[in-house]
Each structure stands twice: as structure tokens, then as C-alpha cells.
Amino acid sequence: MKPLSPLTLSFLLFVFITTLSLAFSNEDVEQVLDVNGKPIFPGGQYYILPAIRGPPGGGVRLGRTGDLTCPVTVLQDRREVKNGLPVKFVIPGISPGIIFTGTPIEIEYTKKPNCAKSSKWLVFVDNVIQKACVGIGGPENYPGIQTLSGLFKIEKHESGFGYKLGFCIKGSPTCLDVGRFDNDEAGRRLNLTEHESFQVVFVEAEANDAEFIKSVV
């Protein structure tokens, strides 16, 4: 492995210190942890589960909704015993590899159906139900449907327990929480909301414990 030059090393150290300084200058910013108190790291595989298990349902997975021909809509499984599909978090650009609350991130599934252009999460506008919903893929998967570019983030939930996801629209100061919407489908859709956010926790997924795409409908 080629050793890093002093200039590169200094730059990376500067980025790391600057990020930490910005993070800890805000008392509300903290490192995101999984249910076992371990830090969440980019590239790791995690299940997104409801903070309160039971009738509220299980983890998040993919499903086919509306007139979409590919299972690209992100749904919360109605079955509380299901963990859903694991995701990984990516910090765009150069980063110290630490995810704090409020850090802009990309979220993507570790597996995707062949018909999906990408495994990355995005937001599409379903005009039938008048909701901005979370999905994966690319514009090709949403013919005639508006898709929104932007980045996600993780914040502490208002209750003080668990976290919530947010989405910030590219080129706009607008950021909205991710909530749930029940449209009497195979699962509850994840959608952008100004009201009740989806209270979640993160569970590290074992490599041999991932559910496969056959679980989608």
C-alpha cells in the first residue's frame, strides 16, 4: 500500500478535526449509535426497525405499489417479526467516517431487484395519494412521476428515545421528517411529513442474516 504524503495526511487530519469541531460546537449533535450502543459507521449493514416493537410492525423492505412495475417502494413490513432488508449509510465526499446526527447521508439497500436502476433511496411524488414517498432506483423506474434529489439525515427523535430520518431537498433549505403512511398495501409507505415522524433504531445485520429480495411483493 502506497504511504500517504504529509500533505494528504495533513488535509485528512484537518477535515477530521473540522468535522469534530463543528459537531461538538452544537450540543444537540451526537454520534449515532445502534441499539447496542455501538457507533454507526458508513458501509456497515443495519436494519432500520421501529423503536417500539409490536403492533406498529417490523423493519423496512421493498414492495410494489400503485402502477409501478418494479418493487421499488420502501415499505415498513406489517409483520413485527420481520427485520426487513439491511441498508448501509454513505457520507458523500471526503469524511472522517463518523455519522453524527444531522450528517448528510445517502441510504442504500445492500441488495436490489434487477429491475431497479439503483439501490439508493430517493423520494418520488405519488400524485394519486398526494404524498412524497421513499423509494429506490432512478427516474426510469418512475415514468411520468416526479423524483426529488437530495440527501437523508439521522436526528434524535423528539421523545428522546431512538432516532428519526429526515430528507433535505437538493438546492432548497427545505428538510422534512420521514414518517409512515398506510395506504392499505402490503406495508406502510415511508413518506415525507411535517407531522408524526417514524421513530426508529438501528440493528447491525449479520452478513448471513440478510433477507433476500424474494421477500418483496
Swiss-Prot record:
Coiled coil: none annotated. Pfam families: Kunitz_legume. InterPro entries: Kunitz_inhibitor_STI-like_sf, Prot_inh_Kunz-lg. Residues 1-26 form the signal peptide. Its main location: secreted. SUPFAM superfamilies: STI-like (SSF50386). Gene3D superfamilies: 2.80.10.50. One of its GO terms (cellular component) is extracellular region. Keywords: Disulfide bond, Glycoprotein, Protease inhibitor, Secreted, Serine protease inhibitor, Signal. GO terms for molecular function: serine-type endopeptidase inhibitor activity. Disulfide bonds join 70-115, 168-175. It is found in: Secreted. Glycans are attached at residue 191. Belongs to the protease inhibitor I3 (leguminous Kunitz-type inhibitor) family. Might act as a protease inhibitor involved in plant defense responses. This is Kunitz-type trypsin inhibitor-like 2 protein. The gene is PIP20-2.
